[in-house]
């Protein structure tokens, strides 16, 4: 209690013995629930909701801690297609394969090739993912949201990073983020289509988008050579 021994807060009633008795009863009456609770405790599962606009602040207490992280509301990653992804923890090659499957490709933004009004976004293969850095990921098969479980990762809840190349920015998101409606934001959609965002919108966390200056001549963006 506050104030030390012998200085209990006025009006405070100690229910600790009653609570202990209830816990003991429930443990004996429902042993399977007790086992499940202990399993969850040992896993230290953190359900990271990418729809939250304050995800970084909400999970600040877990910053620097090792947890099993489930991405909630991230939606599936599509097999055979590029998916923009940004995570609040590092992944080595083994961890990438464990979640996204054998044959998965991961690439980092490296440059732009301009051909008049058509801009080609170029990427370089990588074997590890760093926290807060945006990447594109192509699994062989669909990866369901329920499979986005990352075991024993160390959370680093700094702001997502911006990778700038040749006047273009690849911007990661770790929480729900507003996108400008001025035509400078481009989002990677299904079938590797990069679409210009012309209306105000919000992009969920653990994704990424591109910013092309309004002064550029870009009328279309595409993912460059995959080799």
Residue ranges with predicted function:
Residues 105:
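Phosphate-backbone binding interfaces of nucleic-acid-interacting proteins
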Residues 4-5, 11-13, 64, 114-116, ...:
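A short linear-motif detector with a strong N-terminal bias
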Residues 1-43:
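Middle-to-C-terminal accessory/interaction subdomains
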């Amino acid at each position: 209690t506050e104030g030390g021994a012998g200085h209990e807060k006025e009006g405070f009633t100690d229910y600790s013995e009653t609570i202990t008795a209830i816990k003991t009863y429930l443990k004996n009456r429902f042993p399977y629930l007790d086992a499940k609770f202990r399993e969850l405790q040992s896993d230290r599962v953190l359900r990271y909701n990418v729809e939250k606009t304050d995800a970084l602040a909400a999970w600040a207490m877990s910053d620097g801690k090792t947890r099993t992280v489930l991405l909630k509301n991230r939606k599936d990653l599509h097999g055979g297609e590029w998916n923009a992804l940004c995570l609040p923890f590092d992944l080595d090659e083994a961890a990438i394969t464990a979640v996204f499957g054998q044959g998965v490709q991961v690439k980092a933004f490296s440059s732009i090739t301009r051909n008049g009004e058509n801009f080609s976004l170029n990427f370089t293969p990588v074997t590890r993912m760093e926290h807060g850095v945006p990447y594109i990921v192509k699994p062989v098969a669909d990866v369901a949201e329920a499979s986005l479980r990352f075991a024993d990762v160390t959370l680093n809840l700094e702001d997502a990073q911006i990778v700038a190349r040749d006047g273009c920015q690849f911007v990661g998101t770790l929480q729900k983020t507003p996108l400008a409606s001025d035509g400078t934001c481009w989002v990677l959609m299904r079938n590797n289509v990069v679409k210009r965002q012309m209306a105000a919108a919000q992009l969920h966390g653990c994704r990424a988008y591109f910013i092309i200056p309004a002064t550029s001549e870009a009328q279309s963006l595409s993912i460059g050579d995959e080799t």
